[in-house]
């Protein structure tokens, strides 16, 4: 028997467009809700809120899936372009955007049994919402505010290269239910 989230992930590869949209919308809602409760206090800090494009932040929910699921979802959605993930991250990714604002990144390990973050997540938890991504205008400054004012340490000591030339850092944030949520802050490449 599969979990409701497993069924939603499977429905992303449905030929029925309304079923696919309903699944994407629900996965997006679940990701936003999980992250929203974990980062609620961030919006009280005016500079951080502005850096994260508050009060209406650009949010993408990252869904980690096995390679076969990745292929099925990609084919069912018109074979979207693979984004350029740095090789050291051992991941493949494509983006899906749906009506009503649902944005998903579908992620998998580049190599079965790999050693990257996605492979480790899949080995430990199976398919699911792996991260929630917030677009940010300055990841370095946001990271500094999170460290100084919220005592939230970044996963990496420095901002690093992300997919398609973005700059990223990650934060493992405690949620009110005692769990943890992986938050990615990403900064779009400058148009030089």
Task: Describe the predicted segments one by one.
Residues 65-81, 140-151:
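Amphipathic alpha-helical segments
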Residues 40, 45-77:
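N-terminal domain-onset segments
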Residues 114:
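Glycine-rich, mobile lid/loop segments that gate access to catalytic sites or pores
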Residues 1-68, 83-87, 92-107, 118-141, 144-192:
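Vicinal oxygen chelate
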Residues 57-61, 73, 101-109, 118, ...:
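Short, structured motif recognition centered on aromatic/hydrophobic residues
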Residues 76, 118-122, 147, 169:
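Surface-exposed beta-strand edges and their flanking turn/coil or helix-capping segments
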């Amino acid at each position: 028997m599969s979990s409701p989230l497993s069924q939603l992930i499977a429905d992303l590869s449905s030929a029925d467009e309304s079923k696919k949209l309903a699944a994407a919308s629900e996965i997006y809602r679940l990701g936003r809700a999980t992250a929203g409760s974990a980062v609620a206090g961030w919006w009280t800090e005016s500079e951080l809120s502005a850096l994260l494009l508050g009060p209406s932040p650009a949010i993408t929910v990252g869904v980690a899936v096995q390679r076969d699921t990745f292929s099925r979802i990609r084919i069912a959605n018109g074979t979207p372009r693979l984004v350029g993930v740095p090789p050291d991250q051992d991941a493949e990714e494509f983006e899906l955007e749906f009506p009503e604002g649902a944005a998903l990144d579908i992620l998998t390990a580049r190599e079965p049994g790999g050693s990257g973050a996605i492979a480790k997540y899949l080995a430990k938890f199976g398919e699911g919402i792996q991260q929630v991504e917030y677009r940010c205008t300055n990841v370095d400054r946001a990271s500094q505010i999170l460290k100084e004012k919220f005592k939230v340490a970044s996963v990496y000591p420095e901002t690093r290269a992300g997919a398609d030339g973005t700059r990223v850092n990650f934060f493992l944030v405690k949620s009110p239910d005692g769990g943890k949520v992986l938050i990615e802050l990403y900064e779009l490449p400058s148009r030089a």
